[in-house]
C-alpha cells in the first residue's frame, strides 16, 4: 500500500527525545532525564506491601536516595497481564511543566515529517473480529461470564523511522485534556498515547479513580452530538456494562479504604471522538497503601478485561490472536512517599523505528452487535490514526 502519511504540525520548541518519559495530567505534568535503574519485576500481587514487587520497589527507592536522588519516582508501564515483566524505571531527575502552557505550545508547533505507509494490516480482519464478538456475546449470556473486553490491532509499516516527539506534539494538540504519555521502552521503542481514563491517583491519604465503560461516537452537529450523549446515558446495555465495572471496583476498594464515595449513577465525559459513561470514585486510603498497591489492586478492571476477571481473561486468551503486552495495561508514576497517578493504556500506539502498532478494545455483553463493536473500536483507533494523519 502506498498511502501518504503527512504530518502538518507546528513547532515552537524542540521535540521530546525518544529516551525521555513524559506524562501530562491535570494533577501533575512532568518529563524525566536519564535512567538510574530499570525495574522489570512483574506486578503480580503488587497490591500487597509484602509482595516481591513492592519489596523490590522499596529497595530501589532506598538505593536511589542513597545515591543522592532526593525525591525518586518510578515511571513507566505495567502490562495488561501483570505476570509479565514491567516496563518501569527510576529516572535520574524529573522536571515539572505547565499543562496549560504545553497545550498552547502544541497548538503552535510547526515542524513537519512526511512519511509513506508501505503496509497496513488489521489484526484480526473484520470478519474474524465480528465472529469473536458473536462468540463472546453468546458466552456472556451464560452463567460463565458477564462481560468480556475484546480488542484488535492495526500494524503499520512506514518508509522511514518515525519521530515520536513530533507525534507527541500533534497528539497533545488534538487531545489537549487527555492523560498524554510518552514512555521509552527497553527495546528502543516508545509507548505513546492519549488515555481518557484515570485508574488511580493518590495524593497523601486521598485517592480517586474515574472508570469508563460504555461509549458512543461524537457527532459533528452540536444538537445531534448532545442527543448521542443522552442516548448513551439512557442505554440499558451501556449502563449494565458500566455497572459491572463500578460494582467490582467498589467491592475491592472498600476493604482498603476508611472512606469511599461513589455516585449512584454515571455521568458523561467526552473526548474529541467519543462520549463515555464515567463514575468518579473518591476515598481515603488505609495507612499502608501507596499509589501502586491500589493501582495493582484495581488492574485490570472489568473495563479492560471483563467480569468475572478469571473467566473473562480465559475467553480473551482463547479468542484474541495476539498478546496484548503493554496494551490495556497502565501507565504512570509513583514516588517514594506513596503518591502517584496511573492511567489505563488505551488510545495508544507502540512505535519502534518504522513500525507502529495501534490498539483498541470494546466491552462485550449479551446485547453487543458484532458490526457495532467493529465500528466502536474503529472510532477508538481513530484517536491515534488522526495523529498520524490517517483518518
Swiss-Prot record:
List, in alphabetical order, the GO biological process terms annotated in this UniProt record: enterobactin biosynthetic process
Q: Which UniProt keywords apply?
A: Enterobactin biosynthesis, Isomerase, Magnesium, Metal-binding
Q: Which cofactor does it need?
A: Mg(2+)
Its UniProt entry gives the catalysed reaction(s) as:
chorismate = isochorismate
Pfam families, A to Z? Chorismate_bind
Q: Catalytic residues?
A: 147 (proton acceptor), 197 (proton donor)
Q: What is this protein called?
A: Isochorismate synthase EntC
The record lists the organism as Escherichia coli (strain K12)
Amino acid at each position: 500500500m502506498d498511502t501518504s502519511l503527512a504530518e502538518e504540525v507546528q513547532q515552537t520548541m524542540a521535540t521530546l527525545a525518544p529516551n525521555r518519559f513524559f506524562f501530562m495530567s491535570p494533577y501533575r505534568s512532568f518529563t524525566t532525564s536519564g535512567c538510574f535503574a530499570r525495574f522489570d519485576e512483574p506486578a503480580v500481587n503488587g497490591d500487597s506491601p509484602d509482595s516481591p514487587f513492592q519489596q523490590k520497589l522499596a529497595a530501589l527507592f532506598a538505593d536511589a536516595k542513597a545515591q543522592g536522588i532526593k525525591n525518586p519516582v518510578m515511571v513507566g508501564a505495567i502490562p495488561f497481564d501483570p505476570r509479565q515483566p514491567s516496563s518501569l524505571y527510576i529516572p535520574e531527575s524529573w522536571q515539572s511543566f505547565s499543562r496549560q502552557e504545553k497545550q498552547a505550545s502544541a497548538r503552535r508547533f510547526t515542524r513537519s515529517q512526511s512519511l509513506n505507509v508501505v503496509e497496513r494490516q488489521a489484526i484480526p480482519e473484520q470478519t474474524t473480529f465480528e465472529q469473536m464478538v458473536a462468540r463472546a456475546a453468546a458466552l456472556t449470556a451464560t452463567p460463565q461470564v458477564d462481560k468480556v473486553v475484546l480488542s484488535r490491532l492495526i500494524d503499520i509499516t512506514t518508509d522511514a523511522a518515525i519521530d515520536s516527539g513530533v507525534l507527541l506534539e500533534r497528539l497533545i494538540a488534538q487531545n489537549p485534556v487527555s492523560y498524554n504519555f510518552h514512555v521509552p521502552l527497553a527495546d528502543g521503542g516508545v509507548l505513546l498515547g492519549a488515555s481518557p481514563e484515570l485508574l488511580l491517583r493518590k495524593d497523601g491519604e486521598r485517592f480517586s479513580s474515574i472508570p469508563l465503560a460504555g461509549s458512543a461516537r461524537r457527532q459533528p452537529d452540536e444538537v445531534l452530538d448532545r442527543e448521542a450523549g443522552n442516548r448513551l446515558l439512557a442505554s440499558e446495555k451501556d449502563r449494565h456494562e458500566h455497572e459491572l465495572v463500578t460494582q467490582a471496583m467498589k467491592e475491592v476498594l472498600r476493604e482498603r479504604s476508611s472512606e469511599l464515595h461513589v455516585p449512584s449513577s454515571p455521568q458523561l465525559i467526552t473526548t474529541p471522538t467519543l462520549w463515555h459513561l464515567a463514575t468518579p470514585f473518591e476515598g481515603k486510603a488505609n495507612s499502608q497503601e501507596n499509589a501502586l498497591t491500589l493501582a495493582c489492586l484495581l488492574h485490570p478492571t472489568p473495563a479492560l478485561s471483563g467480569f468475572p476477571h478469571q473467566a473473562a481473561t480465559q475467553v480473551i486468551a482463547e479468542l484474541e490472536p495476539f498478546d496484548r503486552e503493554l496494551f490495556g495495561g497502565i501507565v504512570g508514576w509513583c514516588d517514594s512517599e506513596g503518591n502517584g497517578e496511573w492511567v489505563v493504556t488505551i488510545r495508544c500506539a507502540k512505535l519502534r523505528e518504522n513500525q507502529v502498532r495501534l490498539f483498541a478494545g470494546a466491552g462485550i455483553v449479551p446485547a453487543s452487535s458484532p458490526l457495532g463493536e467493529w465500528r466502536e473500536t474503529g472510532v477508538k483507533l481513530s484517536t491515534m490514526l488522526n495523529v498520524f494523519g490517517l483518518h
